[in-house]
Amino acid sequence: MFIPLSILLLLGCSARINENRVAFDGFMFNSKLKVGLNKKDFEITVLRANRSLTGAKEAGRYEATIYCVNKFGTSDIAWILDPEDVSAVTSSNSIFIKGRCRI
């Protein structure tokens, strides 16, 4: 009885983790955010962007917005390398964007 209950609880936990993920253009993207010396500055790499360039751009924009809202309470971003300016996926199947949270 204990083992089936444990398995059921673990399955429920993994479902909760995945419910917070957002799909863009039908795909889930992993992003890496690096913060600059000035905490307002950030760089984002979106991995596996070869699946959908449009989706990867939106995933990067989403990650940036979440960062700025959580750190500074605003979604206003000054783009240094705007997602809209990204026209191709790199050889490592990723895209790179860069910006600054405006406060």
What are these regions (language model features)?
Residues 1-5:
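Sec-dependent signal peptide recognition
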Residues 10-12:
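C-terminal motif of bacterial Sec signal peptides marking the signal peptidase cleavage site
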Residues 14-17:
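Bacterial signal peptide processing site
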Residues 28-29:
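Alpha-helical assembly-interface signal, strongest on the long, hydrophobic N-terminal helix that forms
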Residues 34-62:
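Post-signal-peptide N-terminal segment of Sec-exported extracytoplasmic proteins
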Residues 65-73:
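Sec-exported extracytoplasmic/periplasmic mature domains
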Residues 77-93:
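Acidic helix-start/capping segments at beta-turn-to-alpha-helix junctions
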Residues 93-103:
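C-terminal edge-of-domain segments
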